[in-house]
Amino acid sequence: MRILFMGTPEFAVPSLRAVAGAGPGFEVVMVVTGPDRPRRSRNSAPEPTPVKQAALELGLRVLEVEDVKDPAFASTVQELRPDVIVVAAFRILPPAVYGAARLGSFNLHASLLPAYRGAAPINHALMQGDRESGVTTFFLQQQVDTGNIILKRSTPVGSDENATELALRLSFIGAEAVLATLRLIAEGRADVSLQDESMASKAPKLTRQNTRIDWNRSAADLHNFIRGLSMRPAAWTTLGGKSVKIFRSAAAPQMSPSSPCAPGSLLIDDGRLYARGTDGWIELLLLQLEGKRPMEAPEFVRGFRPEVTEPQLV
């Protein structure tokens, strides 16, 4: 089976390694990824994508693509004569590309479809407080994340698990799912099921606007919002006119839920930092003030020593 693998971030690397090590009968003829770019900062030297780096370590051929809609890219894919195209955290492909695979093209998506279709499924699942997540493989079609499902793998989600931690776990669960999907296709046993549109939900791209904390929410919702965006891009708020990223929080059941303090109020108790929601408090554990490095709460507190209700997060 001639396999064309497409992916970019660290999430896709375990799947690439699994496919490359699939054994006799499976050949990765090319790895397609994005071009080298500055990744540490705008002025840093260009670096390869995690997928490119892994592919080179595995001795695989790499094709860097800027524009997947370029007809020349579709021609290159067709010339490779792939039996299957495997896509993991890449881009939206045109029909001329995904239609070039003899046995079909499938995508690895980090949710239990049809839930959380879109660019940020892991983040949105955690932000909603879901206690179960997983991955889905499905055949590509023109509408994004709507294709026929090949298989799913589910996993429970910890109450304090953040997006970075869950993404790492799902990357390895996804690698097993990709390999199982390839074997099903190779053996002609890839039975598919339609997605139930009545159960569909969206996971839109994360922006500056939709990652800002609204303190007029319950303490549980605030904790879920923060862990759903940790460590990147991170939930943020403002303090004294400056932006503050909050990377880690925890439930604070020991704090009295009844309080005259408004949502967003800060409280310091024995060097620990708490923020008020509509029905109680959460503890803030790791923060980063604009222009500063990330700090654990005790160090952060020493930097400004607020009173009980001042300053306030907004």
Swiss-Prot record:
Entry-linked InterPro entries: Fmt, Formyl_trans_C, Formyl_transf_N, Formyl_transf_N_sf, Formyl_transferase-like_C_sf, Met-tRNA-FMT_C, Met-tRNA-FMT_N
Binding site for (6S)-5,6,7,8-tetrahydrofolate: 111-114
Pfam families: Formyl_trans_C, Formyl_trans_N
A single MF term (Gene Ontology): methionyl-tRNA formyltransferase activity
Catalytic activity: L-methionyl-tRNA(fMet) + (6R)-10-formyltetrahydrofolate = N-formyl-L-methionyl-tRNA(fMet) + (6S)-5,6,7,8-tetrahydrofolate + H(+)
Enzyme superclass (EC): transferase
Keywords assigned by UniProt, alphabetized: Protein biosynthesis, Transferase
GO CC terms of this entry: cytosol
Catalytic activity, EC: 2.1.2.9
Protein family: Belongs to the Fmt family.
PANTHER family assigned: METHIONYL-TRNA FORMYLTRANSFERASE (PTHR11138), METHIONYL-TRNA FORMYLTRANSFERASE, MITOCHONDRIAL (PTHR11138:SF5)
Described purpose of this protein according to its UniProt entry: Attaches a formyl group to the free amino group of methionyl-tRNA(fMet). The formyl group appears to play a dual role in the initiator identity of N-formylmethionyl-tRNA by promoting its recognition by IF2 and preventing the misappropriation of this tRNA by the elongation apparatus.
Protein name: Methionyl-tRNA formyltransferase
Organism encoding this protein: Chlorobium luteolum (strain DSM 273 / BCRC 81028 / 2530)
